[in-house]
Amino acid sequence: MEKILMLNDDQIWIFKKHTNNIQLLIEVALYLKSNKSSVSKKDKDAMYDIFSESELYNPRESLRDKPLDTINHKLDGLSYFMFGYSDRINDENKFIFSPLGNLFLKYLHDKDKLSKIFSCMLISMQFPHPYSKPSECFLLYPFRLIFKLLLDKRLQGRLYHYEVYKIIIHTISIDEAKYEFLVKSILNSRKKSWNEKLNELSEIQHKVVKSVYEWQYYIVPLLGSLHIFKINNGDIEQKLYHPQKDGSKSPPTARKANNGYVEINDNLTNFIDKLLNKYSFLDTPILLSDSQRKSNDVTKEIYSFYPELLLAEIGETISFESHILNIPKLITEYSKNPDNSTSGKFEKILEEAFNLFIDVEAQWLAGAGRTDIECMYLPINEKFSIEAKSTKNKLSMINSGRLKRHRTLISANYTIVITPRYVPSVRYDIEAQDIVLITADTLAEYLYNNIISNNRDISYADIQAIIVANLGKDISTQISNLTLSKFG
């Protein structure tokens, strides 16, 4: 195959293969929810004991596959399919559910809504994936590409399993030219007989059998059980064998490849088409190795996907939480406006955000020479100011003298600067000043977790305490830890 699609034979998409049963993932997620999402070794051992007694889960006895490894596989499955991610607080691992993960658990008794929610989870999945090291070689949205191909009329609305593990999973990145080449390659493969294609697989069985196993035994059944895929198992099979390990006395393990195919379920076709019109398969994924951002900030952004299109589709109220989650994206969008005409929108959404606190009154102040938002912390009648710093690039400096004048005008005690990212020297600009920094996605995450936990009485007290103890610093880490301690 041409290099336009391939790195080499060894660099292919790797799909998680630790479960093909959505109910098991649900049970693990519900267990985490009911146990404060702690995933320490002690908690994992307890999970192993509980799930070992479940009809859903019967782990094999193995010297290699210890209980800790087994549970890690299940947690990795949740993270892989975008239910959430792990973070640390006070040297303890916690699992943070994503907005879509929470929404999925909310509608467990509605199969139609679950199909649409999980479709969005797949749409949000990117390579490189934070929980799939082999995916770091790629730069695309794998399931957006799969869905795009399934909707391509030239391919008759279907993808044969053979086409996935022989052609598609070798795609490194995608653009229009590569996509057309991919379609052409698939159409050309359909000119071959099935005997010819299955014989090809036999000739390279040691290279392809793992992908056959991942796709046909795990991904396809999982998406079939969620009513995302319609599955045809074909009528021709070919046994493929895994390489035998050195010194093994057991016969090589066989897997069955067949001439089956998948289609998108009829009731999802229009919805997925709408999603792809909004979230293109050509979009560039977020880089995990962004040297300008902390890795946990990158992870937060990846898992913050929460499309209003989905909320409208399932009849979920398009509430303010969706705007909160979009703050980092809105910053980027507004800052690209050449005449900066959208900067006021960022300030307005922050005004709404701080008015979510029951003990804060926030008011946007228009005009030059003034702070962006004036706030009153009601329990002690103390004012503070907010400066909204939307910027296409990293915030390069803070004029602490100017912010002090802004505080003096309204008799504010301190200033909160909210920005997507900044250069390290900005920390020196606020050192020993009555100023703190918070990254936008950190604030969004804290407010969102309050909202989805049905905590409508959000108090500012904890944030106030953090600020008073950390003036002159970036308090994003402390706010993240607060989120984890309350909702992790």
From Swiss-Prot:
It catalyses: Endonucleolytic cleavage of DNA to give specific double-stranded fragments with terminal 5'-phosphates. GO terms for biological process: DNA restriction-modification system. Keywords: Endonuclease, Hydrolase, Nuclease, Restriction system. Its EC number is 3.1.21.4. It is an enzyme of class 3 (hydrolase). It comes from Avibacterium volantium. GO terms for molecular function: type II site-specific deoxyribonuclease activity. This is Type II restriction enzyme HgaI. The keyword Nuclease applies.
